[in-house]
């Protein structure tokens, strides 16, 4: 699978099928600090991403 980290524009490739929570753990990211997007949809921590899919991981930015 192809993972694009934004806003860094860094790309990471992983082989096989992985649960989103496991992907975030492997990348050292905390679930509450990022959004995982497949196509036009948000993907939750419990969902799987297949080897032939691409996802984006975007930092969550909040302001007050």
What are these regions (language model features)?
Residues 1-63:
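Ubiquitin-like/PB1-type beta-grasp interaction modules and other compact soluble beta-rich domains
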